[in-house]
Structures are given as structure tokens and as C-alpha cells.
Amino acid sequence: MSPEDPQETQPLLRSPGARAPGGRRVFLATFAAALGPLSFGFALGYSSPAIPSLRRTAPPALRLGDTAASWFGAVVTLGAAAGGVLGGWLLDRAGRKLSLLLCTVPFVTGFAVITAARDVWMLLGGRLLTGLACGVASLVAPVYISEIAYPAVRGLLGSCVQLMVVTGILLAYVAGWVLEWRWLAVLGCVPPTLMLLLMCYMPETPRFLLTQHQYQEAMAALRFLWGSEEGWEEPPVGAEHQGFQLAMLRRPGVHKPLIIGICLMVFQQLSGVNAIMFYANTIFEEAKFKDSSLASVTVGIIQVLFTAVAALIMDRAGRKLLLALSGVIMVFSMSAFGTYFKLTQSGPSNSSHVGLLVPISAEPADVHLGLAWLAVGSMCLFIAGFAVGWGPIPWLLMSEIFPLHIKGVATGVCVLTNWFMAFLVTKEFNSIMEILRPYGAFWLTAAFCILSVLFTLTFVPETKGRTLEQITAHFEGR
């Protein structure tokens, strides 16, 4: 079939009668690409141990006040939003592999700037650079992994993206116990450097190579990743070079997955995960933990364990079931969390956001301690529920549902939406709590979780066991 053929299909990489692939190098390539999300997670988790270290040991020019500390944590999301746009542009022009290689530059440069910082502006500049790299990695890594994986393991390998993110966060928390902020930034250079070295030996995805009409290179990549090219057919790729045009939004195969992808990112951030993470230390303090920093590590361990569980069962249980189950768990946990605040806080709504988590009820100490444990239990349940579904699956589905020729633009829009919502929710959550009181704010997030369950059951298709071509055909009504 010639490149001018208007037929719109993605590369059909396996004929119906062919044997299932058995190559193991696909797991090595996944690990190499997933070092990007590991770096991304480390950059996100870096601020939690670094801010106390900067306030404790840094010279006067580097001391962070409340405003600077707030921006030190939040500026990553702004850089990541820009990185999402940049990643979407790079994805279709530079390719998946080169985009991953390029994102190592701002990762290493950003941490190097932080290490050499002489004033607060250098700290913020370094964080902005690492945020830019986070945006690119969060977009490109899921796409690369989904395009090299065969259907039987695509859920497992795709879930490794979120697993590596939470592992990176946990690594930053644990390392922060023994390393001060400069050496912690030096450690942050290690994962992207390792990714740079490993990705040099990994192939470009066969799908991208086929869109460039590099048939021999695509077959070589298949042999490297899957062990054999037996049964592979030369695909029709004519329409893949059209690129994205606004007129395409009229086609159901384009606007349906785009709407679903955007909504998944919006609901992920409206679940309240950032609010829970922000208040983890305070909740553990009220439960009488001697070392409140233990909260961060405990939360990180729960995230890693349950994200690993999700990865192991993803290709058996399916995406839709896990998303719905995750949403139900978050509804109950957020409702219980709001109930905790309702029982421990009363009186007129005239407190500032600084004191929102200070109990002002007249309950006896032992009663309040019991309620604090209700909060700890609710928080841990929420984190487990989020990790099983709404943590990894939106990123996995983002990499699965878009046609190949719009993947760069569509994933860029989704990543931009996710990071913009993360910034908006983090920045405005205190204002919402001042208006609705803490219990009202958390009950509102429970309502959003209910909507996410209804959305999942109504609109999200099951992609378990389907090829990417079958998923595209589903949206096109074929």
C-alpha cells in the first residue's frame, strides 16, 4: 500500500494467526524508559525533605521563607505544564526514544543548578528545569512503553510508569533522612544519567519507525524487543503523516478519546490526592507519632505496595474495573476524612488556613486520639485506593486510546491538563477550606470521586487484551 493511501489505520504489527511474542528485552526497554518516571518522582518528592534541610542548614541567602518555600514546591507543576506542551511537540517530530534522551538534560541540569545554588532564585530555577523534564517524561514514557509492549503485558508494563513515580518519591523521602539538600540533589542526577546510558542501546518504537516508512528498522526493533518478526505484516501507514488538524475533531475516533483522556486527568486531580499528601504529616502528629516525618515514608510505602499490586493484576482485572473500585474506595475514605474534621472542628468559620487542622472541639484527649486514628486509617485507605486505580490508570489509558497520528497533540493536551489542575487544586485548596470548612472541602472531593465512578462506568472503554488498533477501531465505530 502506498503512503498516499487515505486509509486511516495504525500499524498492524501482528497478523491474527501469529504466535504471541516471547521476547524479554521489552522488559529491559521498559525499565530504561521508566527511569524517566523514577526521576520525575524523585523531583516531586525532593521538596519535602529539602525544605526543612534548607531552613535548618542553608546559609542566609538560601533560607526559604513561607512564600519561597511554597513556590519551591509549586514551581515544579508550572515547569511540568510547559514540559507537557514541549513533550507533545517532540513526540511526533523527534520520536519517542530521542524525546526520552533529551529530557535527561533538564533533569541533570536542574539538579546541578540546585546543587550549586547561591541564592533562592537559583533554587527556583533548578526546580523549574526539573519540572520541565517531569512534564516531558510523564508524557513520553507511557507512550514509548505502550508502543513497545504486546497486549498481554501492556497493562503490567504501562503501570510501571506510576510505580516508578511513587518509588522515586519514596526514594527522595528515605534519602532525605540521611542526606542534606545539596547531596540529595546530587542523588537526583543519578536516575536520569542511568536512563541516558541505557536508552542509547534501546530501539525506537516500531510504530513510530513505521510512520517514517523505515520498515527494516521497524522489523529490527521488533526482533530486538519481541524476539521474532514471524507473522509480522507490512502495515498501511498513509494517513499517519497527516498530523493533527482541527477538522479532525469532528471524527469520533479523535474527539471521543480526547474528551475521555482530558476528563481522566481532571478527575485524577479532583480526587484530593494532593490535599491528602499535604496534610499527611499533621495527621500523623495528631495520632501521636513521635516522628512526623515517618508519615511521608509510610505514605510512600503504601503507594509503592498498592501500585505494584495494580501492575500485577492490571491485565487480569482490567482498567475499567480497577478504576471503578478505586473510585468507590476513595469515596468512602474521603467521606470518613471529612467526618473526622466535622467531629474535631466546630464553631464559626473565621479561622485562617494556618489553623485549619488544629482541633478546637472540647473532646477528651483519648477521644480525640481515637478520632486522629480514624483520620490516619482514612488517609491510608485513600492512598491505597488511589494507587490501585486512579494513580496509574489515567496515564496508562492516555498512552492506549489515541490514534497514532494525533498522539503527540492529544497526550500533550492531557498532560497539560493534569499539571494545570494539579497547580490549581494545590494553590486553591486552602481557599476552598476557608469557604466550606475542612469537612466541607473533603466531602466535596468525595462528591467528585462519585462523579469519577459514574464517568468510568459510562464512558471509559475496557482496553484489556486489545491491540492499539482494536482500541482505535472501537472509537471509530468499526
Swiss-Prot record:
Subcellular locations according to the entry: Cell membrane; Cytoplasmic vesicle membrane
User: Which positions does the motif Dileucine internalization motif occupy?
Assistant: 12-13
User: What PROSITE patterns does UniProt report for this protein, alphabetically?
Assistant: MFS, SUGAR_TRANSPORT_1, SUGAR_TRANSPORT_2
Q: What is its main location?
A: membrane
For binding D-glucose, which residues are annotated in this chain's numbering? 162, 268-269, 274, 395
Q: Catalyses which reaction?
A: D-glucose(out) = D-glucose(in); D-fructose(out) = D-fructose(in); L-dehydroascorbate(out) = L-dehydroascorbate(in); alpha,alpha-trehalose(in) = alpha,alpha-trehalose(out)
Looking up Gene3D superfamilies in the UniProt record yields:
MFS general substrate transporter like domains (1.20.1250.20)
GO molecular function of the protein, one example?
A: D-glucose binding
The UniProt note on how this protein's activity is regulated states:
Inhibited by cytochalasin B.
* Glycosites: 350
Q: Name the source's superkingdom.
A: Eukaryota
Instruction: List cellular component terms (GO).
Output: cytoplasmic vesicle membrane; membrane; plasma membrane; synaptic vesicle
Q: Which residues lie on this side of the membrane: Cytoplasmic?
A: 1-25, 92-96, 149-156, 204-257, 315-320, 390-405, 461-478
Q: Name one GO biological process term.
A: dehydroascorbic acid transport
Supply the InterPro entries for this chain. Answer: MFS_dom, MFS_sugar_transport-like, MFS_trans_sf, MFS_Trehalose_Transporter, Sugar/inositol_transpt, Sugar_transporter_CS
Keyword Transmembrane helix listed: yes
Kindly state the tissue distribution recorded for this protein.
Answer: Highly expressed in adult and pubertal testis, but not prepubertal testis. Moderate expression in hypothalamus, cerebellum, brainstem, hippocampus, and adrenal gland. Lower amounts present in most other tissues.
Q: Which Pfam families match?
A: Sugar_tr (PF00083)
Q: Which residues lie on this side of the membrane: Extracellular?
A: 47-70, 118-127, 178-182, 279-293, 342-368, 427-439
Topology relative to the membrane: Multi-pass membrane protein
Record's function text = Insulin-regulated facilitative hexose transporter that mediates the transport of glucose and fructose. Facilitates hepatic influx of dietary trehalose, which in turn inhibits glucose and fructose influx triggering a starvation signal and hepatic autophagy through activation of AMPK and ULK1. Also able to mediate the transport of dehydroascorbate.
The entry assigns this protein to a family as follows: Belongs to the major facilitator superfamily. Sugar transporter (TC 2.A.1.1) family. Glucose transporter subfamily.
Q: How does it assemble?
A: Interacts with AP2B1.
This protein's name = Solute carrier family 2, facilitated glucose transporter member 8
